[in-house]
Amino acid sequence: MNWIQALLLGLVQGLTEFLPVSSSGHLMIVRELLGVDGEGFLDFTVTVHLATVLSTLVVFWKPICRLLAGFFKFKYNDETDYVFKIVVSMIPVAFVGLLFKDKVEALFGDSLTTVGICLLVTAVLLVLSDTLPRLLAHGTDIASGESQVRPFTRSGREARNGISYWQAFVVGIGQALAVAPGLSRSGTTIATGLICGVKREVMAQFSFLMVLVPILGEQFLDLLKVVGGDAVLGGGVSPLCLAAGFIAAFISGLLACKAMIALVRKAKLSWFALYCLVVAVLIFIFA
């Protein structure tokens, strides 16, 4: 890998980590197109993922600081409620990641065909997120396309912070399914939330905050493989390439994260579904 290839791969990671089109799938596709050897790619992957985590922290630093300040008051306030729901959303992915991560990776491998199939699944989820809430809702505002479904607790009251615990858990299941390459993490979480009736402005923030710890945990598990001798860091990727990939992923991640927040609030996600469909068809034709 040279620094130009690293720059391009970093850009791809930064853009696709937040857009609902699968960063893992696009990294695999672009790596194949550029002819980049898989040797040493683990350390590059860890590096660019850390860059996109940093992008998220920068974009959401105010809400994160507010959540931490409220949480450490050690009383059940809005911030504590929100943090607990994020923790609940992480239960499914923690279960899958800790117990089945290696089996899932062995099952799917680096197959581009798998990426194509998962992109089709992502496309279906995105279309459903635009259409299903309106079909299920009563009194939907057709002109605005905004579902009138509201997140309620079992007691019948509207959920605190706009999302209930069961909705947070279901969204977490969506995140757990996204371990498959080509199944977008942001796409599945946002789509699952919208299908469950969570408002767009709520999912625009919750979907990005809920993935921070799982992404860091995933990279930590990869590093544990190195410690255990199952993988090697530093093989074939120079510090210059790592730096180029990190900077590209961080800057493009900042832009993509801010853009995606605006898109989730206002735009139809079906346009991304069309993109996923086109890419999947191209994979099936040329892979």
Question: Which ranges hold each PLM region?
Answer:
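Multi-pass membrane proteins that catalyze or facilitate reactions on polyprenyl-/lipid-phosphate substrates
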Residues: 1-287
